[in-house]
Amino acid sequence: MELRAVDGERIADKTVLKMMREMGPRCGIRRETDYHRYNSYRGEVGETFENVLGRDFGADGPWRKMGTDVTEFRCSFGKAYLAPAYDFGSREIVAWSISKRPDMEQQREMLDGLAKAMPEGAEPVMQMDMGWQYQHRAFTGRLRGLGVTQSMSRKGNCLDNACTEGLFGHMKDEFFRGRDWDDFEEFKRDLEAYIHHWNHVRRQVRLKGLTPVEFREQALRGAA
């Protein structure tokens, strides 16, 4: 995709696979046990919501369907947590917070970024699990104020938030696997650099060879 978009070279996907077989590069396949999952479920400790999306993650444009979750990274310095706001239509990570603690301050930082990024008139549905953060009145009230509809996965059904879980899988394969950090701030800088790469550089087949930012900008121009 990069050859086509940047250099104008047209090469079939099957040709690329053939060359990879001949030259030796392989794509690593992750195992479920490779990464640690963060579980924020504490029961019904606040306001809960219906599963509005019902695993229908398809979106015909940006700012229609989104997801959020918290994922954990274990490094030599300790643990770090990422809380993103992920657009299912553009595949863009539109806001995020990287923290040593998965607390409400992290969620406030992510929501501040979401508020700055949202275009006027956007009213997306956001999928999430039943974690305690997402039941907290500070979180639910902030989303209402932004015009975002909450959609909650059923207890024990990670497939209800499969789109965001898929993002975490790609991220941990491409950014985290086989690496380690001794310093949180260095880890944070590197993860933010990867998020920039994901949004602005990494082209995706589902976006017809565009980057998430290119897709979003093209879609919004077409809707104007």
Language-model regions: role of each:
Residues 144-148, 170-224:
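C-terminal domain-tail junction helix/linker
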Residues 74, 78, 96-120, 125, ...:
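Active-site beta-loop-alpha junctions of metal-dependent nucleic acid enzymes
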Residues 55-94, 100-104:
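An active-site-proximal beta-strand-loop segment
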Residues 90-96, 150-153, 177-178:
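Short small-residue beta-strand/loop micro-motif enriched in glycine and branched aliphatics
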Residues 1-61, 157, 213-220:
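Basic, flexible linker segments flanking DNA-binding modules
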Residues 16, 20, 53, 69, ...:
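Mobile genetic element proteins and their domesticated derivatives, centered on retroelements
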Residues 29-37, 126-130, 144-163, 179-184:
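RNase H-like polynucleotidyl transferase catalytic core
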